[in-house]
């Protein structure tokens, strides 16, 4: 995809970003990890509060949320890569965001999913089926599917 280089992606369920201390710690963590792309789940930010997702060196921030402090997903793309945005598709409930673009003239699609607590597998299956035409070999899907691996993980 990127000639002579690589693309690094980190993903994190942050369980809310309304506290200034938590936003500062996230900023420091992203700077330390130094990824190309950072995907966040459970931002808990209202639509009008997305400005709180600012991280130095990260001007491309895509966010999907609702007007309640729950759910919310974000895709942050570092300024160190030349990402050209072509399209963004947001879920109004804040459960997924899809960003289509290109890096060094190579198309890429990034989908970040935060599945609802109830009916997560069915939700993800429906969502991916509805996006079938959008998904190809250059699609990266990151997520918090909210599904236990075994019955022991339910509680």
What name fits each language-model region?
Residues 1-155:
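A shared catalytic/ligand-binding motif for oxyanion handling
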